[in-house]
Regions:
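Glycine-centered loop/turn motif at secondary-structure junctions
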Residues: 48-49, 125, 140
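Short, flexible helix/strand-to-coil boundary loops that buttress conserved ligand/catalytic motifs
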Residues: 28, 66, 105, 140
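Alpha-helix capping/helix-boundary segments
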Residues: 23, 58, 97, 117, ...
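Short, well-structured N-terminal submotif of metal-dependent ribonuclease cores
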Residues: 1-54, 67-76, 80, 134, ...
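Short acidic, glycine/proline-enriched helix-loop-strand junctions
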Residues: 78-100, 106-107, 113, 137-151
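Active-site neighborhoods of divalent-metal-dependent phosphate/nucleic-acid chemistry enzymes
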Residues: 2-11, 39, 88-130
């Protein structure tokens, strides 16, 4: 079974997934190593039965490079592209998420941005978290799907 078919099968088994910033970065950069996976994920996001979430922290991470390079067009392109997926919820930090992130950080030793991503996934009731960072495997509240393992 090919990478795309295997990943599509995995996605269908989860009622809601959460996405780390790396998924968006690889897609927007058209990273050749991960493009089959990210294309599958973003195609899946267009299906009516899909449901996904990410923290607005993701947008912060994505926009650093275009702002650093003073590329207003790329900022607009990112904002336009990323806000158009119908089944992707952009979840801002709340006091509840901040509290959960602090607990995750204390228990699992994650850095604050990662703890916020994990807390957002838990708060959004995601059953899987797609990333390329092994640190998320410390958290048992969801299945961590590493893009490197989906090659």
């Amino acid at each position: 079974m090919g990478v795309a078919r295997r990943l599509a099968s995995i996605l269908r088994r989860h009622r809601r997934i959460a996405l780390d910033a790396s998924v968006f970065i690889y897609q927007l950069e058209a990273n050749p190593k991960y493009l089959p996976q990210t294309k599958t994920i973003f195609s899946w996001l267009e299906l009516p039965e899909s449901s996904a979430a990410t923290s607005t922290i993701t947008m912060t991470e994505l926009l650093v490079m275009p702002y650093r390079e003073r590329d207003a067009q790329l900022v607009d392109d990112f904002n336009g592209l990323l806000s158009t997926y119908p089944n992707l919820d952009w979840i801002p930090p709340s006091l509840e998420i901040a509290d959960l992130a602090a607990r995750i950080r204390a228990l699992h030793g994650l850095k604050t941005p990662d703890a916020l991503q994990a807390a957002t996934a838990v708060n959004a009731q995601a059953t899987a978290f797609i990333t390329n960072d092994k640190v998320f495997e410390r958290i048992n509240a969801f299945d961590t799907l590493l893009l490197d393992r989906l090659l």
